[in-house]
Amino acid sequence: MWVNLSCMCHIVDKLLELNLRRWNMRSTSIYVLASRWKKVVSDNTLIEGQRIRLWSFHSLAKLYIALVPLDPAPAPTLAILLAPAPTPSSPPVVTRDSDELYISHADAQEEGDRILPVHADNDWECLNLLAKVSEETTCLEVSQEANRRSSLVSDTELDLELRLSLPGKNSYVM
């Protein structure tokens, strides 16, 4: 069963609304990006061969998504520099291989926009983002959410803590 929903994606001082579909399964749910991914690619100057990890978290009843580059963008080769620019009729294409996203034919980014890279550490490399979540873990998360709501920390303070606790001072949140 597919259920449509949307989330807010904050990218370099821009707020995009992404359309997602949730596929309910027996013990877990899978979220699939339904549209507006091309806008994310073009606004961030993602290039072919660049490895990116996709993170998401919930806060204040909203779903947030962050793109974290795993390695610096490869230096362009002479063949790429001499290749003709892509035409508007060929939009960016995204393919999925394991837990890494490879981006092809990204448009050039405006000069005013900046993306600051996040350096990967050992904790990120061993994390399997595609691992299934057991029902026991899901119940634990629900109880943690209930405990958080009954704590003395306000939602605003907790949201600020979430933003400050993201790894690396050069990270960006969507």
UniProtKB/Swiss-Prot annotation:
Question: Origin, by domain of life?
Answer: Eukaryota
The alphabetical list of record keywords is: DNA-binding, Nucleus, Transcription, Transcription regulation
Any one GO cellular component localisation term in the record:
nucleus
Q: Does the keyword tRNA processing apply?
A: no
Q: Which GO terms describe its molecular function?
A: DNA binding
Coiled coil start-end: none
Keyword DNA-binding (UniProt): yes
Ranges of the DNA-binding region feature: 1-71
Q: What InterPro entries does the database record attribute to this sequence?
A: At2g31720-like, DNA-bd_pseudobarrel_sf
Q: Where in the cell is it found?
A: Nucleus
Tell me which PANTHER family the record gives.
Answer: B3 DOMAIN PLANT PROTEIN-RELATED (PTHR31541), TF-B3 DOMAIN-CONTAINING PROTEIN (PTHR31541:SF61)
Task: Specify the protein name.
Answer: B3 domain-containing protein At2g31862
